[in-house]
A protein has these predicted regions:
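Conserved AMP-binding/adenylate-forming core of the ANL superfamily
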Residues: 1-6, 10, 18-49, 57, ...
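Conserved pre-ATP/AMP-binding loop-to-beta segment of ANL
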Residues: 2-5, 17-18, 113-130, 137, ...
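Conserved AMP-binding/adenylate-forming
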Residues: 27-29, 43-87, 172, 352
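Conserved AMP-binding/adenylation subdomain of ANL enzymes
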Residues: 149-166, 174-214
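Gly/Ser/Thr-rich phosphate-binding loop
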Residues: 212-217, 225-283, 296
Length: 437
């Protein structure tokens, strides 16, 4: 990989010291102050024995302190992982991980110690991100400094960067989509407004009252904003990823004056692989766009393959390509149209749902003889989790939903239960899910 500067926070603090870097919960931090605070966090980590190449996890809710901790750990040379909103319990972390919590950040804010610059080699790992679990349990992905830098540059060349940009981040920071917003904004020298999560009223107010120019959303969040009458036309870009979005929803957003650009990406490729350009939003409804500059995408036997400097080195197969497991096609102009997944994963509201988990929980109910779970296209959720049940006697579907809630995460609970007399199967007995929806 080519040498490339990775001391982007130092660069932005030097060239745009008074520009707001972080905003959230009534607090704003400019780049000069962020560099000071990040240096103090790096010094605090050194006191804890963490430095270059060591694993550090941030156990803080999404917000300005989380971003300060992230940049401090990067400045220390650590390999950083963000914890999910629910905290560290049960989360896969590297051996010997040092945790940064609220107390660490408060101590760092008070000590304000200087810390030297650090430029990481582009081939060295920068972040440890758990994949979304497309083909099973989430797996750790090590993304290099070069992966993040090239992803930011490719996105900038495609979407553009304006000096007064303020990117609204309401996505979880333990996922690469949220994490990338914090890093890109530091690389660009632009602001990021961080919300502790997605709240439709709060985002609606932010779009109305704050200078938000870019928003990253999953499809269900876009639907909720449309239903709330939010000013979706105010930002210069709405970036939509994380799952399928219906053409009706896209047309509605475009009809309200929004510039909606779909994107296709994944953890192993450091978010965006293909993304529509702002000028293509209306003409290419339903497409995920062309590959970003520096990235290649092709389709082999229906499967989307990716290679380029944004791909995690360990994710590459022997042929030099990342085999995504996603299905799609490239049109004659090179635009990608995502057509589903090679496996049966359901993406509902931006969350991955494994049908086998849901089926196992439902089969624990004594009145369920057989069950198959599939995703049905849905305006709000992208795909609604739907259970098709062969009953063993009398079955109250509402009672079955209650049963599911006691055993599954909220996003895994079926939105609908349909009673059927039999499940469609192959000659070998496998359920044909595609015939259910």
């Amino acid at each position: 990989m080519h040498e490339a500067p990775t001391d982007w926070l130092d660069h932005s603090a030097r060239t745009h010291p008074d520009t707001i870097a972080l905003a959230g919960e009534g607090e704003e931090v400019d780049f000069a102050e962020l560099r000071v605070l990040a240096g103090s966090v790096a010094a605090a980590l050194a006191d804890l024995g963490a430095g270059i190449g060591d694993p550090v996890a941030i156990d803080l809710p999404a917000g300005v302190p989380h971003a300060i901790a992230l940049h401090g750990a990067i400045l220390a040379g650590a390999v950083v992982q963000s914890m999910p909103p629910g905290g560290r319990e049960g989360v896969d972390v590297a051996d010997g991980t040092v945790f940064l919590d609220a107390g660490c950040i408060e101590r760092a804010r008070s000590r304000r110690e200087p810390w030297p610059s650090y430029s990481r080699h582009p081939a060295l790992p920068l972040t440890r991100v758990l994949s979304s679990g497309t083909s099973g349990a989430p797996k750790p992905v090590l993304l290099t400094a070069g992966n993040h830098l090239w992803s930011a540059l490719g996105s900038a060349l495609n979407l553009g960067v304006e000096r007064d940009d303020r990117w609204l981040c309401c996505l979880p920071l333990n996922h690469v989509g949220g994490l990338a917003i914090l890093l890109r904004s530091a690389i660009y020298g632009t602001a990021v407004a961080i919300h502790p999560g997605f709240d439709v009223e709060r985002v609606t107010v932010a779009l109305e009252e704050e200078p938000i120019s870019v928003v990253s959303l999953v499809p269900t969040q876009l639907v909720r904003l449309l239903d709330a009458g939010a000013a979706v036309d105010r930002p210069r870009l709405l970036l939509i990823g994380g799952g399928p979005v219906s053409a009706d929803v896209l047309e509605e957003a475009l009809g309200r004056g929004a510039t909606v650009v779909q994107t296709y990406g994944l953890t192993e490729a450091c978010t965006q692989v293909c993304t529509l350009g702002p000028g293509e939003a209306a003409a290419r409804v339903g497409s995920a766009g062309r590959a970003l500059p520096g990235t290649e995408a092709r389709v082999d036997d229906g499967e989307i393959l990716v290679r380029g400097p944004t791909v995690a080195p360990a994710a590459l197969a022997g042929d030099g390509w990342l085999h995504t497991g996603d299905l799609g096609r490239l049109d004659d102009d090179g635009y990608l149209w995502v057509e589903g997944r090679r496996d049966d994963l359901i993406v509902s509201g931006g969350e991955n749902v494994r049908p086998d988990r849901v089926e196992a929980a439902l089969l624990e109910h004594p009145a369920v003889a057989e069950v198959a779970v599939a995703g049905r296209e849905d305006r709000r959720w992208g795909q609604a989790v739907t259970a098709f049940v062969v009953a063993a006697g009398d079955l109250d579907t509402d009672e079955l939903i209650v049963h599911a809630r006691s055993r599954l995460a909220p996003h895994e609970v079926p939105k609908t239960v349909e009673l059927v007399t039999e499940l469609p199967r192959t000659g070998s007995g496998k359920v044909l899910r595609r015939l259910l929806v």
